[in-house]
Amino acid sequence: MKICVIIPTLNEEKNIEKIFIKIKKTKIKLDILFIDDNSKDKSQKIIIKLSKEFKNVDYIFR
């Protein structure tokens, strides 16, 4: 069974990597789905970078 953590974001560039690191430190294998609601900061760029580096990270941009 896979577990997916869904993380809604809106202008969270300062927090995305922090929460990602905390989730990654768990011993549970998780998929991570960021759902961004048209952030005006660099949130989407950070999310794209993470998704390229880690195969368990995906995103939806609205």
Q: Can you annotate each of these PLM segments?
A:
Residues 1-2, 25, 52-53:
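Short, Lys/Arg-enriched, disordered terminal segments
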Residues 2-4, 31:
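Cell-envelope/extracellular polymer assembly enzymes that use nucleotide-activated donors
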Residues 9, 35-37, 62:
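Conserved sequence signature across two-component system core domains
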Residues 12-26, 46:
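Short, well-formed alpha-helical segments that are part of the catalytic scaffolds
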Residues 30, 44-62:
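Conserved donor nucleotide-binding strand/loop of the catalytic core
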Residues 36-44:
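A conserved acidic beta->alpha catalytic loop
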